[in-house]
């Protein structure tokens, strides 16, 4: 193992195809494993820095590093698990161990974690890696969770929480979005799981439809967490509670780059609140102040009227999910939840304004929403190249028609 570790560190930046072709130069090195470790380390750099920085860890499956949680989302999930356990010591069974990143983060909060994985080589690597990371409260088991095995798995682990991140790729790497298409199938297993423990924490594709997923899972969904970081929606987490009979809460979370030292921006609501919320699109003589573009988590949550209502914002249009405020204090409050722009000018979207704006701001970012052209078409009409002179928006206002807004990031 020491030779492999040294080889990986020495060749971390090398061309992997060349290493494979020249494998005969290093007869005492398992080149397939070495290449997989190098691939994985490249993916883990900046994603799970503590793992990348530990030279003793091995990674036999490159795809696992690509699919594993980041440090930020791993920390968030472990904190959520602790809240599910009401802050008390808890036991957790991870039925989809994979690379082991989630199990490792859970182990920092849990009394004991049981890692279950169907691929033997991942289990061998996980046991080695957990020891190298001094994670002494993780038990590794090489087993697949099926209706035939789940009772034995949970009888041994005796968990307070079961965690599942079902594999979302089918044959040929095809992405799967429906719950029943993923492995293991939580729809098949959930009733058996509930006979052994009260709580299930389920991670789904961030592309999954929340309403459909919760409907398929039955009335036991207690909370839905949409977790975004780095401008991308990364995870969709569903907390299921065997004893829950109420409406589920949706929490949209934006994790800042400084998380966990910096608090996340979170916005919680129930669907019934969004249904009765109203957003003002009242007529105005001008559009001025600040423009707010909700982050990916809020957009996924679909709480478009509640955003306007809770933050006291004017919504440009029923189907245009951009908001305006004249308050600097409000603009500062909104920053963690998305992007805020200072409005320099607003004018009708027509040939004259397009020509004048393109000439005045030749290097600008461009966004088109809810108007009869897409972003690329508007960019070509403006004749601008990408740059930071301004950010030009083509947006539809219910009261003023199609607008051309010239803004700068606030």
Q: Which residues are covered by each model-predicted region?
A:
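SAM-dependent transferase fold signal centered on methyltransferase-like domains
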Residues: 1-410
């Amino acid at each position: 193992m020491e030779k492999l570790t040294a080889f990986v560190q020495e060749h971390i930046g090398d061309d992997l195809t060349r290493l494979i072709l020249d494998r005969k130069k290093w007869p005492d090195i398992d080149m397939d494993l070495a290449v997989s470790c190098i691939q994985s380390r490249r993916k883990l750099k900046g994603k799970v820095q503590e793992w990348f920085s530990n030279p003793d860890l091995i990674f036999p499956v490159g795809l696992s590093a690509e699919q594993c949680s980041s440090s930020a989302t791993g920390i968030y999930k472990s904190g959520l698990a602790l809240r599910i356990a009401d802050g008390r010591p808890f036991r957790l069974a991870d039925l989809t161990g994979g690379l082991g990143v989630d199990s490792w983060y859970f182990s920092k909060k849990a009394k004991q974690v049981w890692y279950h994985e169907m691929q033997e080589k991942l289990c061998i690597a996980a046991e080695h890696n957990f020891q190298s990371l001094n994670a002494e409260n993780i038990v590794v088991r090489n087993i697949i969770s099926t209706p035939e095995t789940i009772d034995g798995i949970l009888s041994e682990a005796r968990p307070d929480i079961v965690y599942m991140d079902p594999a979302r790729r089918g044959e040929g790497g095809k992405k799967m979005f429906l719950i029943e298409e993923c492995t293991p199938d939580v729809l098949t297993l959930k009733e058996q799981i509930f006979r052994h423990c009260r709580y299930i924490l389920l991670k789904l594709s961030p592309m999954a439809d929340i309403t459909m997923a919760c409907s398929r899972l039955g009335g036991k969904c207690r909370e839905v967490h949409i977790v975004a970081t780095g401008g991308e929606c990364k995870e969709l987490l569903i907390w299921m509670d065997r004893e829950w009979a109420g409406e589920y809460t949706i929490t949209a979370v934006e994790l800042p780059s400084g998380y966990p030292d910096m608090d996340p921006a979170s916005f919680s609501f129930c669907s019934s609140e969004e249904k009765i919320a109203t957003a003002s699109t009242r007529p105005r003589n001008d559009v001025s102040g600040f423009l707010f573009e909700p982050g990916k988590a809020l957009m996924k949550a679909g709480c478009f009227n509640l955003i306007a209502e809770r933050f006291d914002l004017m919504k440009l249009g029923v189907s245009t999910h951009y908001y305006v405020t004249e308050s600097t204090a409000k603009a500062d409050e909104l920053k963690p939840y998305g992007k805020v722009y200072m409005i320099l000018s607003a004018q009708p979207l027509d040939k004259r304004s397009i020509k004048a704006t393109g000439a005045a701001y030749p290097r600008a970012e461009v966004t088109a929403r809810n108007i009869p052209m897409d972003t690329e078409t508007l960019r070509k009409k403006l004749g601008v190249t990408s740059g930071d002179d301004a950010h030009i928006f083509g947006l539809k206002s219910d009261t003023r028609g199609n607008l051309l807004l010239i803004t700068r990031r606030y």
